[in-house]
Amino acid sequence: MFKKILSARGMGQVLSVFAALIVMIIVFALINPLFFSATNITNLLRQVAPILIIGVGQSFVLITAGIDLSIGSVAGMSCMISATLMTKFNMNPILTVLITIVCCLAIGLVNGLLISVAKLPAFIATLGTMIIARGVAQIVNGNMNTNGIYSDAFKNFFYYGRFLGIYTPIWIAIVLFAFFAFILSKTALGRHVYALGSNYEAARLSGVNVAAAQTKVYVISSFLAGVVGLILTAQ
């Protein structure tokens, strides 16, 4: 993957994206002088934090040459479960978070087992769990709008709070990015992930537990989607 990025064509594509981004930043700065204000920058970072978190999970999946179509529905399911538990059942926020994350991990585990053990194509397996997660979300909240998250601690921890002047979603994204970047670059699981993406059969023959590695990848993806759902709930 990195060889493709570092190739002349790959570098050209990367540089063109950065050039377009720089042009957009310059244009917005000229249109509105407050674009580079600290308030605007922190608000932008807070809004893109969920995308970064989702991107971390998808990086694991894509490196293994897989695909996870269920992440959007898992995030939505996380929203509905957490919101319903706190509004309809007045559940403690900590217990709510634990139950929500466990439900999301279950979806990731099912994805991993369907792909690594049942040998279903990742597209088909995650399409099925996408539909399941979406159905669970609708069943949990009765297909009705859920309003009134009254737990200030929950809202501050996942969205509105600040630490050192920076919104908590940004800190959550930074911590998760650093943690999973470490896993990907410094642990056996990270090496196995790259091995799977490079050559699945060679990885298996070299002694890598490919089923376990694949399952962990999809569990990580669903876990991070669940965290994003909690952030969106707090928002």
Where are these regions (language model features)?
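Hydrophobic residues within the alpha-helical transmembrane core of Major Facilitator Superfamily
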Residues: V23-I26, I81, I132, A178, ...
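Transmembrane helix-bundle core of multi-pass membrane transporters
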Residues: A8-R9, F123-T187, A213-K216, Q235
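Structural signal for alpha-helical transmembrane segments and their membrane-water exit/capping regions
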Residues: A20-F36, A137-N141, A181-A188
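Membrane-helix interface segments
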Residues: L69, F89-L95, A122-F123, L189
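Single transmembrane alpha-helix segments in multi-pass membrane proteins
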Residues: M24-F89, L113-K119
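Transmembrane alpha-helical segments of polytopic membrane transport and secretion proteins
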Residues: M1-L15, A19, F36
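Hydrophobic alpha-helical transmembrane segments
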Residues: V14-A19, L44, L52, S73-M77, ...
